[in-house]
Amino acid sequence: MLNRRSNALITLSRTKFFPITTVAYYHRRLPNQQRRAVSTSPKKEIKSLEDLANLDSLDGVDTELIRDLINEHTTKLNIKKELDMLKKFSQEEESGHEIPVKRFIRPLWMFILMGSSVYLLLHFSWWKLEHEERESQLKKEVEILEHQLNELIVQDKTHNTSRGKGSNESTHMKPWYRRWFW
């Protein structure tokens, strides 16, 4: 967060681990605008450090002007460095708040595999119990049907023995084609 006041640039950055407050002062008028350079030659005016570097010697240059230019350039570099540092901190803070999806992929796969394994195990046991129940029901039905069949066979034998003596002789006396059709 940047706040500008009349003569200060205040930058604030607060994170979990360390709060940072930075104050950088700047001048409304830069030092080279406040004073005109006093140079050895009247043709050249010194406005920046580059102009000082182009001079052959610094003998006739005011030391206050040199100090102001150096301080101005240092202040600019410090402000740039602090802003870069704050941008870096803010980017780290933003990236720290983002939860990477990669953190959840493996636990999600583990959950899916464990869940499907438990589901298959429970489904298999349920199917087996249902199969055993159905098998016992079918065995009971088979026993009931066998019992009914045995009763019918016994009834048929008793019924055949009671009417069988007279009717067997009469059926054997008939020709074969009459036994089938009448």
Swiss-Prot record:
<keyword id="KW-0496">Mitochondrion</keyword>
<keyword id="KW-1133">Transmembrane helix</keyword>
<comment type="similarity">
    <text>Belongs to the INA17 family.</text>
</comment>
<keyword id="KW-0143">Chaperone</keyword>
<feature type="topological domain" description="Mitochondrial intermembrane">
    <location>
        <begin position="128"/>
        <end position="182"/>
    </location>
</feature>
<keyword id="KW-0175">Coiled coil</keyword>
<keyword id="KW-0812">Transmembrane</keyword>
<protein>
    <recommendedName>
        <fullName>Inner membrane assembly complex subunit 17</fullName>
    </recommendedName>
</protein>
<feature type="topological domain" description="Mitochondrial matrix">
    <location>
        <begin position="46"/>
        <end position="107"/>
    </location>
</feature>
<feature type="coiled-coil region">
    <location>
        <begin position="128"/>
        <end position="158"/>
    </location>
</feature>
<dbReference type="GO" id="GO:0005743">
    <property type="term" value="C:mitochondrial inner membrane"/>
</dbReference>
<keyword id="KW-0999">Mitochondrion inner membrane</keyword>
<comment type="subunit">
    <text>Component of the inner membrane assembly (INA) complex, composed of INA17 and INA22. Interacts with a subset of F(1)F(0)-ATP synthase subunits of the F(1)-domain and the peripheral stalk.</text>
</comment>
<feature type="transmembrane region" description="Helical">
    <location>
        <begin position="108"/>
        <end position="127"/>
    </location>
</feature>
<keyword id="KW-0809">Transit peptide</keyword>
<feature type="transit peptide" description="Mitochondrion">
    <location>
        <begin position="1"/>
        <end position="45"/>
    </location>
</feature>
<keyword id="KW-0472">Membrane</keyword>
<comment type="function">
    <text>Component of the INA complex (INAC) that promotes the biogenesis of mitochondrial F(1)F(0)-ATP synthase. INAC facilitates the assembly of the peripheral stalk and promotes the assembly of the catalytic F(1)-domain with the membrane-embedded F(0)-domain.</text>
</comment>
